[in-house]
Swiss-Prot record:
Name of the protein described by the UniProt record: Chromosome partition protein Smc
Biased composition (Polar residues): 829-838
Pfam family, one: SMC_N
Native source species: Delftia acidovorans (strain DSM 14801 / SPH-1)
Principal subcellular localization: cytoplasm
Role according to the record: Required for chromosome condensation and partitioning.
Subcellular localization(s) per the UniProt record: Cytoplasm
Binding site for ATP: 32-39
SUPFAM superfamilies the UniProt entry points to: P-loop containing nucleoside triphosphate hydrolases (SSF52540), Smc hinge domain (SSF75553)
Record's subunit section: Homodimer.
Gene, per the UniProt record: smc
UniProt comment concerning the protein's domains: Contains large globular domains required for ATP hydrolysis at each terminus and a third globular domain forming a flexible SMC hinge near the middle of the molecule. These domains are separated by coiled-coil structures.
């Protein structure tokens, strides 16, 4: 194990990062005084765990941080790192498996000090454990600073023994013995406490057994009381439930009867409504039959007129045949008569029409009034029904109020009785003396507070340790996950690189390229990059040119084809020669595909600009298609997927060659390489966090063990005081509880009495209010009943007037239609007369034909049918009127029955109200006893079974309960917790007995371990002493050129005795080394240190100007000895002596050209010697 390098940053005068490389076995550090050479020694001591500022030549640990100069700011942190070659695996612990170990310490201005081994955060103790037994440490014999040589030789014997122990490697044994002694001390203390607790616990067991016997009697009696009370409540609950069921059944019967009667009323109302509808339908049928009768009457009149017309026509024809002149006169006379009659008919027709319109308006008006009257009737009926319900509601409220008043009177009597009994109990209550009890309770409170504080600390640690463990596990998982992700990214990267290499080396072109010596050239794709997402577009545009090769001149590619062009490449291949400059970018309507390229080579950009001159981009295929009309001939638009659109075509891209995907893979490889590097950093940070989490978890676990011990001790003390206090506190507590309970009961009873009185007064006032409200409601109900009868009368009169008006309107309409028919007949007569007058010349022949043609047979037959139909319709009208009258009588009778049924509902509703009140009272009783049973946590099935098995009756149960209460009172004060305390005490005694046995066994084991460690340490230290003493006796004359020296044990026991140095240079018989000169002391110390090295050579040794007190002759002997020992130990020494410099295999110069800042410089031997002479 050797030191490879020392890295300093911000440590003392080394403001900048400085790396001391130590390749040889003898490395000398030279430089003028005050340049910072000794800071190197301080740095090594500091990183190995030195925590005392004075040992580092400072007042505080902050002094090791560079504090700035006139031209430099102070550093924010100090860092020192030692890099060791551990190829021989000499380092101990888990780090021994590493071939190289880097130990690092970092200190910030905030005072945060951190240690790292191989970039993993560790504790200071972990750093020291690595070098246990190697002679390395903050104050080990392998680091000899200025003045340390003299301090070693002048150390007290006990201090000098430490160097011997370090050389013997017993540091780990001493650490084990110290830990074992700590455990033995803790075990002894625990055993003493357990024995004290056992003595106290045995004293308490007898008293607890007596108290537990009384508590068992109390529990048995209390169980009987609970059972009897639950049986009483159960029986009362069953009685209330039976009463509720009985009242509910009777109430349901009354409700069913009410519903039956209500169903009768609804059926009656339904029939009444049906009769009303039938009444309306019958009225409509009468009107329809009357209308049909009017139509038949008009038809008979029409047929009679036709018959008359035929007879008159025949007579007229005959008269015409006899005398034309008489016919003309006759027709003229008839025309005049018809015209006169038309004039008369016009006046009658206008009167008839006015009468019909007036009657129609009256019918419409009367019809519009009818709904208002029906609404008024319904509103009156609704108000009457609502008022009737209000009357019933008020009556029910009066009945409920009366029952409530009776209940309040009964409650008041009960509470007054209870009030008197409680006052008597309080007067008879005695209050015990509590002076001593208060003192004990104060002590108990203090003990409990201490126990709570210990529990709080324990709980906090119990909460934090799992969290820290979870954090440790989480960070371990994070380390695994980050490592897996790093491996995954690395695998993906290697796969892509392999695929890329395979594409480059495989294929048909590769042999041809190798043949012409072109296989080592890079394709175009490896020299360009494009914005992410546009790789396919660029491949689609360039195709085989993406793999183009660069040549100096394009003329030289003809030589690749061979003579006659028979050696052409087996696949498409492009060459390019970049020009000297790049063309200026051209502005356009579209974005050029070349604008997306990332190419630094101007010539290469010019080539690509030429190839992609007419290539543009569009974000989507839809946009490219929509704007293709803007393209000029030869221009093409590419979308990210590689599809191409020109002004008259669309080409879809697909990977169809061995060069496809080269550019995308190249960019992905570049991205993955960045991710792999970033992931490596993340993995390192995760491992560092894991080390910190494991350290925090281990520290918290140790604190948890101590906290558990302290919590156990506090709980034991509190338990002892609680047991002592319990006996005294029970009587006082029971007296206070009883007094408080009586006071609370009295206050409650007074409040209940006051509340009952207020409720009783309010009930009386409410009763009077409801009485007056009932009288008002009944009066209002009577008024509303009269209003309903008046509305029904007005509605019936309105309906009768409507039917009369409808009949008159139908008659007026029939009269108007008859006049219109007569007027039409007269108009035809006038027309006929006019025609006859105009055609007298040929009338004779036509008259003869008409005489033959005219006949009344058809009219006579139609007349008889019309008369029969008229008679039938007259009978139908009479039948409809008879039905209408019958329905009117039935409607009146049905309405009277409805009113009778409604009056019969009031007594039945009153009975239902009474049943509801009874059921409510039974339900309240049921709920009361159910609540009591539920609050008592009673098992209803078990209570019911106990009642059935013992044939329990309600009578006498209360007396039995009172008797049990008296027996309980006779027991006096009872410690109810005695049973649990006795059980806990016995369990605790069993546990403490086992713990005593375990602790005794542990003490024996620890004492045996200490004896074994002492024996091993004594044997190892004795052997080391003899060996070192021999080496010391041999090296002393070698350094002094004679004389003698030895080590002497100052006591009988080597484990605790000191070591004294006896040294006598040549010619001297001194009895103590304090009589030696400084140079002699230095040589003696060097001899002792080197003697220790002979036994257990440290990996390296640091010597800070130890040759300063020596003359040249002693220095030469010192240098020779160091040179011989460098075969097994690496030496780093600081010296101003040219003799010492000559033995160095490597020289490191330290200078301070900038005031206050140390730097290293290369030094040759001549410069070093001259520097030594100048110093």
């Amino acid at each position: 194990m050797r030191l490879n390098s020392i890295k300093l940053s911000g440590f003392k005068s080394f403001a900048e990062p400085t790396n001391f490389m130590l390749p040889g076995q003898l490395v000398g550090v030279v430089g003028p005084n005050g340049c910072g050479k000794s800071n190197i020694m301080d740095a090594v001591r500091w990183v190995l765990g030195e925590s005392k500022a004075s040992e580092l030549r400072g007042e505080s640990m902050q002094d090791v941080i560079f504090n700035g100069t006139t031209h430099r700011k102070p550093a924010s942190r100090s860092s020192v790192e030692l890099v060791f070659d551990n190829s021989d695996h000499r380092a101990g612990g888990q780090w021994g498996q590493f071939g190289e170990i880097a130990v690092k310490r970092v200190l910030t201005r905030e005072g945060n000090s951190s240690y790292f081994i191989n970039n993993q955060a560790v504790r200071r103790r972990d750093v020291q454990d690595v070098f246990l037994g190697t002679g390395l440490g903050p104050r080990a014999y392998a680091i000899i600073g200025q003045g340390t040589i003299s301090r070693i030789i002048e150390s007290r014997p006990e201090e000098l023994r430490l160097f011997l122990e370090e050389a013997a490697g017993v540091s780990k044994y001493k650490e084990r013995r110290r830990e074992t002694e700590n455990r033995l001390s803790a075990t002894t203390e625990n055993l003493t406490r357990v024995e004290d607790i056992l003595r106290e616990l045995n004293n308490n067991l007898d008293r607890l057994e007596k108290q537990a016997e009384v508590a068992a009697q109390y529990n048995a009696l209390q169980s009987q009381v609970t059972l009897k009370q639950q049986q009483l409540w159960f029986l009362k609950r069953a009685e209330a439930e039976a009463e509720q069921d009985r009242v509910r059944v009777e109430g349901l019967q009354a409700v069913n009867e009410l519903e039956e009667r209500m169903a009768d009323i609804r059926n009656n109302e339904s029939g009444l409504e049906t009769l009303r509808q039938a009444h309306y339908d019958a009225s409509d049928q009468v009107n329809q039959a009357q209308a049909k009768l009017y139509e038949s009457t008009a038809e008979v009149g029409k047929l009679e007129a036709e018959i008359r017309y035929v007879l008159e026509g025949r007579q007229r024809v005959q008269q015409r045949l006899q005398q034309l002149s008489e016919q003309v006169l006759l027709w003229n006379s008839r025309r005049e008569e018809a015209e006169a009659e038309i004039e008369n008919l016009e006046g009658a027709g206008m009167d008839a029409e006015e009468q019909a319109e007036m009657l129609a308006a009256q019918v419409e008006e009367q019809s519009m009034r009818l709904p208002d009257l029906e609404d008024a009737l319904r509103n009156a009926q609704k108000a009457d029904t609502d008022q009737r319900a209000s009357v019933v509601q008020v009556q029910q409220q009066i009945q409920v109020l009366a029952a409530e008043q009776r209940s309040l009177d009964e409650q008041r009597r009960q509470f007054e009785t209870r009030f008197e009994r409680l006052r008597a109990d309080r007067n008879a209550l005695e209050t015990p003396d509590e002076a001593r009890l208060n003192n004990l309770q104060s002590q108990l409170q203090e003990a409990r507070e201490l126990a709570e504080m210990a529990d709080a600390v324990l709980n906090e640690l119990q909460d934090s340790v799992p969290q820290l463990d979870e954090d440790r596990r989480t960070r371990q998982q994070a380390v695994n996950a980050e490592a897996a992700r790093h491996a995954d990214l690395s695998a993906r990267l290697e796969a892509l690189k392999a695929l890329q290499e395979k594409v480059k080396t495989d294929g048909k072109l590769q042999p041809w390229l190798a043949k012409h010596g072109l296989d080592g050239m890079q394709g175009l794709w490896s020299r360009i990059a494009i914005e992410p997402g546009w790789e396919n577009a660029l491949e689609a545009a360039l195709r085989e040119r993406l793999g183009a090769l660069e040549v100096g001149r394009l003329d030289m590619v003809r030589g690749f084809l061979g003579s006659g062009g028979h050696d052409a490449p087996p696949a498409r291949l492009a060459f390019f020669s970049p020009p000297q400059g790049a063309p200026a970018p051209a502005a356009g309507r579209w974005q050029h595909l070349s604008d997306l390229l990332r190419v630094n080579d101007a010539g290469l950009r010019a080539v690509l600009g030429d190839w992609l001159q007419d290539c543009y981009t569009a974000p989507t295929l839809e946009e490219a298609l929509s704007r293709r009309s803007e393209l000029r001939p030869g221009e093409t638009v590419y979308v990210p997927t590689g599809h191409a659109v020109s002004s008259h075509s669309v080409s879809f891209y697909a990977q169809d060659s061995e060069q496809s995907g080269l550019l995308a893979r190249a960019q992905e490889i570049e991205h993955l390489e960045k991710e792999v590097r970033a992931q490596a950093l993340i993995s390192d940070e995760s491992r560092t966090a894991l080390v910190r989490a494991e350290s925090a978890y281990a520290e918290a676990s140790q604190r948890l063990v101590s906290a558990r011990r302290e919590a156990s001790e506090s709980q034991s003390r509190a338990h002892e005081l609680q047991v002592e206090t319990l006996r005294l506190s029970q009587l006082a507590e029971q007296a206070r509880a009883r007094n408080a309970q009586i006071s609370a009961d009295l206050a409650e009873v007074e409040a209940q009495l006051s509340d009952i009185e207020e409720r009783r007064v309010a009930a009386e006032a409410r009763f009077e209010e409801l009485d007056m409200q009932l009288a008002d409601s009944q009066e209002r109900h009577a008024q509303l009943g009269d209003k309903v009868l008046e509305s029904e009368r007005r509605l019936n009169e309105s309906r009768e007037q409507l039917r009369t008006l409808e009949r008159q309107a139908q008659e007026a309409t029939f009269s108007r239609r008859s006049l219109e028919a007569r007027r039409g007949e007269l108009s035809r007569t006038i027309e006929t007369a006019s025609q006859q007058a105009r055609s007298l010349a040929d009338e004779q022949q036509r008259a003869q034909d008409e005489l033959t043609r005219l006949t009344d047979a058809a009219a006579q037959g139609g007349l008889q049918d019309a008369l029969d139909l008229k008679m039938q319709r007259e009978q139908a009208v009479a039948a409809r009127r008879s039905e209408y009258d019958d329905l009117t009588n039935k409607l009146r009778a049905s309405d009277e029955r409805r009113q009778q049924l409604e009056k019969a509902l009031d007594p039945l509703r009153q009975r239902i109200t009474e049943f509801q009140l009874k059921e409510q009272a039974a339900r309240l009783g049921l709920e009361q006893y159910s609540t009591l049973l539920e609050e008592a946590g009673a098992d209803l099935a078990a209570v019911s079974q106990s009642i059935a098995e013992a044939n329990v009756r309600m009578h006498g149960l209360q007396g039995e309960i009172d008797r049990l209460h008296r027996e309980i009172a006779a027991l006096g004060a009872v410690n109810l917790a005695a049973l649990d305390e006795l059980k806990l005490a016995r369990e605790r005694k069993t546990f403490l007995d086992a713990q005593t046995e375990d602790l005794t066994q542990a003490m024996n084991t620890l004492e045996d371990a200490i004896r074994k460690i002492d024996a091993e340490t004594r044997e190892l230290l004795s052997g080391t002493f003899e060996t070192v003493n021999g080496h010391f006796g041999r090296m002393f004359p070698e350094l002094f050129g004679g004389g003698q020296a030895k080590l002497v044990i100052t006591g009988d026991e080597i484990l605790d005795s000191g070591v004294q140095v006896i040294a006598q240079p040549p010619g001297k018989k001194n009895q103590t080394i304090h009589l030696l000169s400084g140079g002699e002391k230095a040589l003696t110390a060097i001899a002792l240190v080197f003697a220790i090295f002979q036994l257990n050579p440290a990996p390296f040794c640091l010597l800070d100007e130890v040759d300063a007190p020596l003359d040249d002759a002693n220095t030469e002997r010192y240098a020779k000895l160091v040179a011989s020992m460098s075969k097994s130990t690496q030496f780093l020494f600081i010296s101003h002596n040219k003799i010492a410099m000559e033995m160095a295999q490597q020289l490191i110069g330290v200078t301070m050209q900038e005031q206050g800042v140390s730097r290293i410089v290369a030094v040759d031997m001549e410069s070093a010697l001259s520097m030594a002479e100048l110093s």
